[in-house]
Curated annotation (Swiss-Prot):
Tissue specificity field: Brain and interlimb region.
Positions with biased composition (Basic and acidic residues): 17-31, 78-89
Topology of the protein relative to the lipid bilayer: Peripheral membrane protein
Protein name: Protein sprouty homolog 2
Domain notes from UniProt: The Cys-rich domain is responsible for the localization of the protein to the membrane ruffles.
Alphabetical UniProt keywords: Cytoplasm, Developmental protein, Membrane
Organism: Gallus gallus (Chicken)
Subcellular location: Cytoplasm; Membrane
Triggers of expression: By FGF signaling.
Region (Disordered): 1-31, 54-146
Family: Belongs to the sprouty family.
Listed Polar residues bias regions: 1-14, 132-141
Length: 313
């Protein structure tokens, strides 16, 4: 028989002709009766069924496509595949048809095998992930908005966040019993005469340096610095000191140098004036106690009652 057969109907006609050639014309075939009772689905109907999306966006649980189509696959294992074709060819044709059915959405494929008797039929079920991605996108919206991407800046200063210590609470509460002034270290520290840097911060302009350079004592300090062999000797800093070593030698050397530099005789009076100015400046600017021997009294700050802001009647 030289007839051109096509995909579905041609193979069935070929099988029907082979069965008719081997039996009498009067007897009905049992296979024909079963084939007429079982509804055979065409490729177009299979493609329309597989393309449906059974996902829902509501909280209700949708029935799974595998559970719903299980009775159909069990009752019709032979009708989904044409008779006489190999199993792998039929599976490749169905998979190719379903791939071209929905090319726009990403598909997730799962293969399930159902066995009936000694034969098994392979089914391919496809489902779209677009609803799943839409649900995930809507649920992750509030979470993404609540993420802190930048550290908020604190409006409080660092000094306000520090806990108050005992020294801060009672820093100025200790008073002198005689004069009544504060006896903390900050208030009792002696105040010195002001000074500043000049010549691009290379020279310190202070009252002590003015006296040293004005009376040529800086030359004597340089002479003692280069003639001293002891690194720990401080005679170059205080050449007129009587408490350090080599006191007689230093005073004798200064007497000889004063013959060539008579301005050295003004050093002692200028030093006395500097001490007097320093004492006056300290007395005016030091807020604390200057008593040498006095008792300390702890004074508490009196509590001020809250003001009443009500209007008088």
């Amino acid at each position: 028989m030289e007839t051109r057969v096509q995909h579905g109907s041609g193979s069935q006609a070929l099988l029907q002709a082979r069965r008719d050639s081997g039996r009498p014309h009067g007897e009905p075939d049992l296979r024909d009766v079963l084939t007429q009772q079982v509804h055979i689905l065409s490729l177009d109907q299979i493609r329309a069924i597989r393309n449906t999306n059974e996902y829902t966006e509501g909280p209700t649980v949708a029935p799974r496509p595998g559970v719903k189509s299980a009775p159909r696959s069990a009752s019709q294992p032979k009708s989904e595949r044409p008779h006489g074709l190999p199993e792998h060819r039929h599976f490749g044709r169905v998979q190719h048809t379903q791939t071209h059915a929905s090319p726009r959405a990403p598909l997730s494929r799962s293969i399930s095998t159902v066995s009936t008797g000694s034969r098994s039929s392979t089914r391919t079920s496809t489902s779209s992930n677009s609803s799943e991605q839409r649900l995930l996108g809507s649920s992750s919206g509030p979470v993404a908005d609540g993420i802190v991407r930048m550290q908020p800046k604190s409006e409080l200063k660092s000094s306000e966040l520090k806990p108050l210590s005992k020294e801060d609470l009672g820093a100025h509460s200790y008073r002198c019993e005689d004069c009544g002034k504060c006896k903390c270290k900050e208030c009792t520290y002696p105040r010195t005469l002001p000074s500043c840097w000049i010549c691009d911060k290379q020279c310190l302009c202070s009252a002590q340096n003015v006296v040293d350079y004005g009376t040529c004592v800086c030359c004597v300090k340089g002479l003692f610095y280069h003639c001293s062999n002891d690194d720990e000797d401080n005679c170059a800093d205080n050449p007129c000191s009587c408490s350090q070593s080599h006191c007689c030698t230093r005073w004798s050397a200064m007497g000889v140098v004063s013959l060539f530099l008579p301005c050295l005789w003004c050093y002692l009076p200028a030093k006395g004036c500097l001490k007097l100015c320093q004492g006056c400046y300290d007395r005016v600017n030091r807020p604390g106690c200057r008593c040498k021997h006095s008792n300390t009294v702890c004074c508490k700050v009196p509590s001020v009652p809250p003001r009443n802001f009500e209007k008088p009647t």
